Amino acid sequence: MAKNRFNQSWLHDHINDPYVKMAQREGYRARAAYKLKEIDEQDKLIRPGQVIVDLGAAPGSWSQYARNKLAQGKRRDAVREGGIDGTIIALDMLPMEPVADVHFIQGDFREESVLHQLEEVLAGRAVDLVISDMAPNLSGVAVADAARIEHVCDLALEFAQNHLKPDGALLVKCFHGSGYSQIVEKFKHQFKTVAPRKPKASRDKSSETFILGRHLKQPR
């Protein structure tokens, strides 16, 4: 009975969520697009001509937002792919419906075959921005969940270290909990500038937050 009440409450909140309604109206696949939008408007992350990698991209709302932003910024004389000035590569182990002008690679980005596909698209270019809305399956057991969250952030940090330009940026989703301070310290070890972000589009009840790192300390 309690579970049914919880499901009904969640459904009520979801249906009446202004960001859900806005996403439906503006054609975004998930309300998460507005989290990236708020952070981008604050920090000016996405700019014409960039190479952007979206980790854990499905269902694709972050790639959609990035694509729309690069389409708005296209220059008449730009060398661009399709309707955007720049390159967006989305990776996920899950399938994802195509997004216009976005290269999608399905698979685990730790595997050689997936990295080979990525390198083919990059064609020797370094990445300007890595965005990650990845989240592990949470068990409700605090210690186990903290380890899973930290592992996902570690994967994004390692990917960024291997692919970012020296002045590049990494934005990852994280959760406040027992391991949060350790994750922040890892960011500070890797980036010159580190800042937490809690966009208004994140639900009030959620411990979700985002960490933004800029300018690698030891670029490869």
Swiss-Prot record:
Function: Specifically methylates the uridine in position 2552 of 23S rRNA at the 2'-O position of the ribose in the fully assembled 50S ribosomal subunit.
GO molecular function: rRNA (uridine-2'-O-)-methyltransferase activity
Protein keywords: Cytoplasm, Methyltransferase, rRNA processing, S-adenosyl-L-methionine, Transferase
Pfam family for this entry, one: FtsJ
GO cellular component: cytoplasm
Catalytic reaction list: uridine(2552) in 23S rRNA + S-adenosyl-L-methionine = 2'-O-methyluridine(2552) in 23S rRNA + S-adenosyl-L-homocysteine + H(+)
The keyword Nuclease is annotated on this UniProt entry: no
Record-listed E.C. numbers: 2.1.1.166
Top EC group: transferase
Chain spans, region Disordered: 195-220
Designated name of the protein: Ribosomal RNA large subunit methyltransferase E
Gene from which this protein is expressed: rlmE
UniProt cross-references to SUPFAM superfamilies, sorted A to Z: S-adenosyl-L-methionine-dependent methyltransferases (SSF53335)
Active site per the UniProt annotation: K173 (proton acceptor)
Protein family: Belongs to the class I-like SAM-binding methyltransferase superfamily. RNA methyltransferase RlmE family.
Superkingdom of source: Bacteria
Primary location recorded for the protein, binned into one broad class: cytoplasm
UniProt binding sites for S-adenosyl-L-methionine: G60, W62, D92, D108, D133
Compartment(s) where it occurs, according to its Swiss-Prot or TrEMBL record: Cytoplasm
